[in-house]
Amino acid sequence: MSQLKPQEVVRLGDIQMANHLPFVLFGGMNVLESKDLAFEIAETYIDICKRLDIPYVFKASFDKANRSSLHSFRGPGLEKGIEWLGDIKKHFNVPIITDVHEPYQAAPVAEVADIIQLPAFLSRQTDLVEAMAKTQAIINIKKAQFLAPHEMRHILHKCLEAGNDKLILCERGSAFGYNNLVVDMLGFDIMKEMNVPVFFDVTHALQTPGGRSDSAGGRRAQITTLARAGMATGLAGLFLESHPDPDKAKCDGPSALRLSQLEPFLAQLKELDTLVKGFKKLDTH
């Protein structure tokens, strides 16, 4: 067994991620649709987060490898996608998070991305976990829809044994019958007991997998309710995807927040986060 323990506070430059500190935002778009759109979304997030004093990391995927159809849009691919993300990072001086799907991608992605993300569907794939951990990048581990919160410790142990203690756990909902996800609010506390920063992916928790026959549906109208509920538990951060016109987004539009609503949405969560973390902790054991 590894002697390493997860870092309770994960640091990325001036950004500190911990469950007791002001929340950090991993935000952006689902998949890189075009370079111009990525720049537009990044600039909008950056401007709003500066006004609201929210630490920010830009998120976008270069490839969506688990689409429902062979004909679904997947993105620009590894080479061009990493180039675009690197350009955004350099132009805006903003940290980057993106996901990795295969072991060979881990090293080149980690050269550009500050945080590399382990997809929920792939979170038990040992070769992928080990390759990602060995990059020494911060790893955002998505909780699989089919795993209980307490089972996430096994994935943490794999990363620690591969020599990486810069780990984040991210809730994104649990399978509830067919074509539905629910979020167990008690699961946040279970994962926080593992002494790692815990984030909430409110976007993908709103999915209805396979709900549109050839793609996932979503419940965008309920995003405020779910985000408030999750952030009220006291979390290290929020994962959020937005789009100027979600109904025309090339992936997961039904779950994406309209970009024009981003500032009032985040302002509410900022106020809630400050309130919750100002409460005195009660020992109810």
Curated annotation (Swiss-Prot):
It is an enzyme of class 2 (transferase). GO terms for cellular component: cytoplasm. GO terms for biological process: keto-3-deoxy-D-manno-octulosonic acid biosynthetic process. Pfam families: DAHP_synth_1 (PF00793). It catalyses: D-arabinose 5-phosphate + phosphoenolpyruvate + H2O = 3-deoxy-alpha-D-manno-2-octulosonate-8-phosphate + phosphate. The keyword Cytoplasm applies. InterPro entries: Aldolase_TIM (IPR013785), DAHP1/KDSA (IPR006218), KDO8P_synthase (IPR006269). It comes from the Bacteria. GO terms for molecular function: 3-deoxy-8-phosphooctulonate synthase activity. It is found in: Cytoplasm. Pathway: Carbohydrate biosynthesis; 3-deoxy-D-manno-octulosonate biosynthesis; 3-deoxy-D-manno-octulosonate from D-ribulose 5-phosphate: step 2/3; Bacterial outer membrane biogenesis; lipopolysaccharide biosynthesis. Its main location: cytoplasm. Its EC number is 2.5.1.55. Keywords: Cytoplasm, Lipopolysaccharide biosynthesis, Transferase. Gene3D superfamilies: Aldolase class I. NCBIfam families: KDO8P_synth, PRK05198.1. Belongs to the KdsA family. This is 2-dehydro-3-deoxyphosphooctonate aldolase. It comes from Acinetobacter baumannii (strain AB307-0294).
